[in-house]
């Protein structure tokens, strides 16, 4: 268990969507990586301290996380087009797992800002969080297919994951 209870709750929610042991193992690994990195990156003692760093520049942490999600999505969109990476040290599988974790972390950061907002913004936030959980699910599913050497399903789940960029951008624009 991490010090971020909402992260733990969300990982558990996504685990319940899977019966495949490979997917469960990927989610366990994601949680272990998050816990280790959260400890290494969070000098403040707060969960997700590195993601909060952008607040020093007046950028909300969840928006900073959205930028990181955008970086990972750009990399994966290029992978879909080129079918390879020039930087060999990072595989597409690593990128989708990073993306899945960033999606969960952004959902955690949105959870923190929900209470002071109106019902309208609360509804928007819940839709964004649902999109983020689905994004994470599709990323884990794609990683599972790759680990199981399933070539029959191709990259359909990666494409589904990438389809969540537009609604997340719409949420960001609406939350101005």
Give, region by region, the residue ranges found by the protein language model.
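Intrinsically disordered, low-complexity regulatory regions
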Residues: 2-176
């Amino acid at each position: 268990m991490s010090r971020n209870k909402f992260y733990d709750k969300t990982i558990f929610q996504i685990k319940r969507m899977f019966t495949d042991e490979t997917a469960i193992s990927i989610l366990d690994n994601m949680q272990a990586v998050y816990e280790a990195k959260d400890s290494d990156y969070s000098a403040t003692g707060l969960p997700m301290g590195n993601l909060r760093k952008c607040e020093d520049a007046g950028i909300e942490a969840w928006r900073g996380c959205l930028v990181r999600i955008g970086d990972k999505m750009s990399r994966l969109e290029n992978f879909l087009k080129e079918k390879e990476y020039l930087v060999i040290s990072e595989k597409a599988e690593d990128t989708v797992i990073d993306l899945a974790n960033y999606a969960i972390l952004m959902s955690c950061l949105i959870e923190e800002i929900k209470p002071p907002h109106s019902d309208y913004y609360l509804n928007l936030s819940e839709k964004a969080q649902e999109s983020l959980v689905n994004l994470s699910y599709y990323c884990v599913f794609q990683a599972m297919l790759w680990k199981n050497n399933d070539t029959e399903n191709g990259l359909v789940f990666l494409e589904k994951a990438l389809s969540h960029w537009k609604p997340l951008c719409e949420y960001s624009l609406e939350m101005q």
